[in-house]
Every structure is written in C-alpha cells, then in structure tokens.
C-alpha cells in the first residue's frame, strides 16, 4: 500500500564495517550493498585501502537509500559492525544516537558505555568455528544486522551471494547462508 511506499522512501542508512584485514570486512560490506542494488535502492560501497590493510584494520562504508546519495562519505554511521578492538575504539563513539553496534565479542572485550545506542554482543568468531564455518564470523554479524534492523530482505542475500561468489566456489553460497542463519537466530 501507499503507507509502505512512503515508509520505503524514507530509508537512508549508513553502515561502517571494520576489523582486521582477512576477516572478510570488505566482502560483508559488498554483500549488503549488493542486496540493496537487488532491491533497486541507491547504494554506495567505499572500501578503505591503506597501509593498515595487511594485518591491520580494514573498513568500508556502505550507504543504502531510496533517494540519490548526495555524498557517499560519512563520519557517523547508523549501524556499525566491528570485529576487532582497534575498530571498536576508533568507531564506537561515532555511531549516531539511536544507532546500533554489532560487536564480535569473541574478539572484543570492551563493553560499550553509551546509553544512546543499542549494542549487540555476538561471539561471532567462536560461533563460526563451533559450526564448522571458520572465517565466516563476518556473515554471522550480517545476519544479526538483518534481524535487528530489517535494512534488507533476507531473500536478497541468496541472489547477491550467487552474483558475488564465482561459480567455481559455489559451495560457499550455502556456507554463507548457514552463517547468516546463525546470526539471524541469535
């Protein structure tokens, strides 16, 4: 109905994904951005490549909007997915008031003191290892993001994974969906 159309028009969310290079940070951001494209929204995905990439901290910024994105660069995200302590320290204070932070509590011991945001502590790295999908903590956190924000439809994820993952590695599609499901159930 018209109400739904109106609600959709108001969607304009920004997300920062951050962690060590090698934790699949850029992939997670690309996946969410791709889902936005499948849903015919405006999206931007800006990876930060820099001296910190190898072994250091990698991050990317994603916008998903129903209106044209005037500037894909932002400082204060609505949502934050963080997978290491340096990222936690760098970004936790930048989340918008009323925003949400998704924290890999297997990797980050800090607890958020802010009362104006919602923090979700997900032992994503431990859960991935326990479920035989080591290296997919990033997607477990994406599942939790979807569950708590509804930013994209779960159905879009399978289509996006099939586009992003090369055919030679298509077994990874099912493993990613398993990781997503674990995150959605937490």
Where are these predicted regions, by residue range?
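Short, small-residue-biased leader/transition segments that mark boundaries at the very start
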Residues: 1-6
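Active-site cofactor/cluster-binding pocket
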Residues: 10-186
């Amino acid at each position: 109905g018209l109400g739904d159309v109106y609600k959709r028009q108001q969607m304009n969310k920004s997300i920062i994904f951050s962690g060590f290079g090698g934790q699949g940070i850029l992939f997670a951001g690309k996946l969410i951005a791709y889902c936005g494209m499948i849903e015919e929204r405006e999206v931007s995905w800006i990876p930060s490549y820099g001296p910190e990439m190898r072994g250091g901290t990698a991050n990317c910024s994603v916008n998903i909007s129903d209106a044209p994105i005037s500037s894909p660069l932002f400082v204060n995200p609505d949502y934050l997915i963080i997978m290491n302590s340096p990222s936690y320290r760098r970004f936790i204070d930048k989340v918008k008031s009323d925003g949400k932070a998704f924290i890999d509590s297997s990797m980050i011991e800090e607890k958020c003191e802010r009362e104006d945001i919602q923090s979700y502590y997900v032992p994503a790295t431990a859960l991935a290892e326990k479920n035989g999908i080591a290296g997919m903590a990033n997607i477990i956190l994406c599942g939790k993001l979807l569950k708590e924000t509804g930013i994209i439809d779960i159905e879009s994820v399978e289509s996006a994974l099939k586009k992003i993952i090369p055919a030679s590695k298509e077994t990874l599609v099912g493993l990613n969906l398993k990781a997503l499901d674990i995150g959605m159930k937490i």
